[in-house]
Amino acid sequence: METDQKKRPTGMTILLVLSFINACWNIFSSMVMFMATPKLAEMAQNGEVENLMAPFTATMSEEMRESMLAGMNMIAQIDTKYWLFLGILFIGSLMGVIRMFKGDKRGLHIYAISQILILINASFYLYPHQPQSSFVSDLLLTAIFVLLYYLYFKRMEMQNNEPQTPELP
């Protein structure tokens, strides 16, 4: 259902801009990681990750350095298909955001489906390497954005269905 673009609430515009930035950033970073992960995995296997990270970790505490190296080694273990699927799914998310920006409620469906598939993708490839709290926070953030978009579209529909009072000359 098309809605009047002029009546889009400011809060929805802010959410759309944030979602647009998030989708663009994730498309870019997913493609970079898709290309870089094989080399990173090779470096992790050869024990070269610590040398690679040395300039960045030199001023860190031992605990922070170990945590960062563990994170890099974890990233090296993630299948490259995860990054490919993630990039494709964020393209879908971006398409949904663009449609919503134009006032098309179908964009909400595209966005929501893409975000759910992103969570499913991460469940197979990413979350097994991370604490459960990561899944919960991602799920909550996704649910909040989808719910807010839904509520804004409902509000816009109600505003568009209100009887118009004729203007006096």
Tell where the protein language model's regions lie, with residue ranges.
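Topology signature of small-to-medium multi-pass alpha-helical membrane proteins
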Residues: 2-169
